[in-house]
Amino acid sequence: MRRRFVGALAVSEQISRTENNAMPDFGSWGTAWWKPLLFIIVAGHITNVCVTLFLHRSQMHRSVKFHYLAALPMRLWLWLSTAIVTKEWVACHRKHHAFADRDGDPHSPLLEGLRNIVLKGAFYYRAAVRQPGVLEKYGKGTPNDWIERALLTPLNWLGILLMLAVDLYLFGFFVGPIVWGVQMIWIPFWAAGIINGVGHALGYRNFEVKDESRNISPIAIWLGGEELHNNHHADPHSATFKAKWYEFDIGWVYIRLLSLFGLAKVQYARGSSRG
């Protein structure tokens, strides 16, 4: 009787192992606290860089052209991490430049208050792109290829669900949703909130322009170079946001590196071809 019980237990354990091996390895990166933190930081910086290089400098201001092999990965990453539709983002930002800190600006802290822009910047963005005629007037010239028409625009929600699946697989059912949640508020906070809010309220100015844009920091790394916001508003079509010798624009560094491999072509840069 004892032998039969032990044998049945062994068979049960073997079946359990087989079933477990057949299941996806959720939490495959383990439980070390620093792993999800590192992932958030690296993924967040990549998102910031894709926004400033592809959406802002290339699509919005036409200051740099990217080879398809460079542009497509950035477009796909933004699809996965933000659900941003290129035409909507470009239209909103062009309207911002047309009415910077005046009536009509979609996200001015002078009009709406700094706290509102920092905390609710994404809501102002959505309200702007839903206004009749905004996309038609300000969203011209953005990609209209097959992948945009079939996937990135009509199924923009699908990318962030795939990212959720990745986060669940890497970090499990508890930490994974937290990582995903941080990714989902990343651009609404850092771009719509900090750049468009703090970048028009706090910081230093190299140039007297018609709006209240400010440089948040002379060393522009975390936000891909967008910290140099006053420099950008003074010369919006420049591929480099650096204006002084002591300033650093990491976005410009990435552009120069891509140029070395024939993946980027600068159309205009402040000062000279080397920025």
Each predicted region: which residue ranges?
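Active-site-proximal inter-transmembrane loops
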Residues: G139-W146, L202-L228, H232-D235
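Non-catalytic, topology-defining segments of multipass membrane proteins
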Residues: R2-I194, V198, S238-G275
